[in-house]
């Protein structure tokens, strides 16, 4: 998750982690809250890892994208991820559960907190919502086990070391990593939600 509103790359990171852990031989599931989903209920199955059961309108675009691009990885939606997590264990034999945007989700215990920090807009203007973009104080970096700096190739006006020093000010133990975001293809917007083949125009 992150401590600011807006896109830091949480969903692509969840996708990458899920694929990597799946390829290690673990049974992994993704638990997504279903942002902007029309579906309402306790546990929604977007995909069982073999078949899609919802479209982007029902599941929300983030959950649908994950389900579309992650074969063999069930994707569940629901506001209470303690419920979706329990369902994943009981029905899919989940060994690893990844929460997409779960840094503020206290109802489910976790073994690791991965905090994403946008190198382009590090901590906004330093103020909490609604005055600023912070979901919680910067000092809450202390909870993270891993801090992933995203979009480091796009950062202008702030050095990576400055960001890392801010992180270390509140958390000396967290592993700090860096990532870049690179688009891979264009998809026609009017058809993207119906396409499950991953086809597009390569960049």
Identify the function of each model-found stretch.
Residues 2, 6, 13-21, 85, ...:
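Functionally constrained cores in energy, signaling, and assembly domains
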Residues 35-178, 185:
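Phosphate/Mg2+-binding loops and adjacent switch elements
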Residues 3-9, 96-97, 119, 193-199:
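Short, charged low-complexity intrinsically disordered segments located at boundaries
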Residues 1-50, 154, 200-202:
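Walker A (P-loop) phosphate-binding motif
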Residues 10, 125, 189:
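Short acidic, gly/pro-rich beta-turn/loop elements at beta-sheet edges
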Residues 175-203:
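C-terminal-of-GTPase-core extension/linker across diverse P-loop GTPases
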């Amino acid at each position: 998750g992150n401590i600011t509103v807006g896109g830091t790359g949480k969903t692509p990171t969840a996708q990458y982690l899920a694929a990597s852990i799946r390829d290690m031989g673990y049974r992994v599931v993704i638990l997504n809250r279903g942002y902007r989903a029309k579906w309402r209920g306790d546990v929604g199955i977007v995909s069982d890892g073999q078949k899609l059961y919802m479209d982007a309108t029902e599941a929300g675009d983030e959950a649908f994208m994950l389900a579309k691009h992650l074969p063999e990885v069930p994707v569940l939606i629901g506001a209470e991820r303690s419920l979706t997590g329990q369902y994943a264990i009981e029905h899919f034999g989940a060994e690893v559960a990844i929460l997409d945007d779960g840094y503020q989700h206290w109802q489910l215990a976790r073994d690791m907190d991965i905090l994403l920090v946008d190198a382009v807009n590090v901590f906004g203007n330093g103020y909490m919502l609604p005055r600023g973009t912070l979901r919680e104080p910067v000092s809450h970096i202390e909870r993270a086990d891993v801090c992933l700096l995203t979009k480091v190739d796009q950062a202008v006006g702030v050095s990576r070391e400055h960001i890392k020093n801010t992180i270390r000010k509140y958390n000396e133990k967290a592993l700090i990593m860096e990532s870049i975001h690179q688009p891979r293809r264009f998809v026609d917007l009017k058809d993207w939600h119906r396409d499950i083949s991953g086809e597009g125009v390569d960049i």
